[in-house]
Amino acid sequence: MNIPQELKYTKDHEWVKIDGDTVTIGVTDFAQGELGDIVYVEVETLDETLDKEEVFGTVEAVKTVSDLYMPVSGEIIEFNESLEDEPEKVNEDPYGEGWMIKIKLSDTSELEDLLSADEYKEVVGS
């Protein structure tokens, strides 16, 4: 299982890449493996400001539909529109072309609540 050291993680199996006050968010390799083949990603919250732990979208796989939660508060400034036609990118490259949203961070102190790669490995038993 791939858990890049440079990223931060949540117990909801999302990864967070921090670049100044812009944060890129996606689901982890573990999550995409548990979900199975992803057939649809829906994000209807573009340009909205959401609080930490609010639902920003859903991911639909062959066997289930799961909510996607904000790991930190912020304004959703970009959605990976390529996922509309190629949702399988989440399975194939969850940390690269399978990213889901970018947000403008509202509260940098919330970053302290995210997990390191080693802490996330403990969550998934890796």
Swiss-Prot record:
Pfam families: GCV_H. The keyword Kinase does not apply. It comes from the Bacteria. Residues 22-104 form the Lipoyl-binding domain. The modification N6-lipoyllysine is found at residue 63. GO terms for cellular component: cytosol; glycine cleavage complex. Keywords: Lipoyl. Its cofactor is (R)-lipoate. The glycine cleavage system catalyzes the degradation of glycine. The H protein shuttles the methylamine group of glycine from the P protein to the T protein. This is Glycine cleavage system H protein. It comes from Christiangramia forsetii (strain DSM 17595 / CGMCC 1.15422 / KT0803) (Gramella forsetii). The gene is gcvH.
